[in-house]
Amino acid sequence: TLFPYTTLFRSVEWEHVVPAHAFGQSFKEWRDGDPNCIDNKGKAFKGRNCAQKVNMLYRYMQSDMYNLVPANGQINALRSNYSYAMIPGEPRRFGNCDMEIEDRKAEPRPEIRGDIARIYFYMDDAYPGRGIISKKNRKLFQAWAKEDPIDNWERERAKRIEAIQGNHNKFVE
C-alpha cells in the first residue's frame, strides 16, 4: 500500500492545528523534565507527558478548543508536527482531499488556509512568548488570511467555542 496508516484511513480525530510539539518545546518541563515527572519505576521523564502533568498553562494550551479541529486520522498521522507551507507542483496523494505533505511541510486546501492562519494568530496572541509563529510563517499566514476570509461557519464555530470555553477569539470577527 501507499500508506502504512490504513487503520487510520476512516478515523476522525480531534487534532491540534498548532501542533503541541510547536508550543510544547517552549516549556521547561517539556525540554528538561521536572522533579515531579517520575514514572512508577522511578525513571524521570520529560516531553509532552511531563508538561501535561505539572504545567497548568501547557494543559490550557493543549486543550484550547480554538486549536482543535476534526482531522482524518491517516492524514494527521502523516502530517505529524510539520510546519505549514506552500508546496509547488505537488502531486495529489489523498484522492479528493486537497492536502499535500512533502519534505516535512504540509499544505492545506485553499478553503481552510485562512482558518488555519487565524488559529495560529489566536494561539500566538492568547499565549504570548511561546514562539508559535515564525517570521516566515507570519507572512504566509497573513497572505492566507487575506486569500481565505472569515466565513459563516468559522464565525459560528468561534461563537460556540466562546460559549463553552469562555474566551473570545478576536481574529474571527
Model segments located where?
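Short, small-residue-biased leader/transition segments that mark boundaries at the very start
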Residues: 1-8
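Domain-level detector of nuclease and nuclease-like folds
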Residues: 9-173
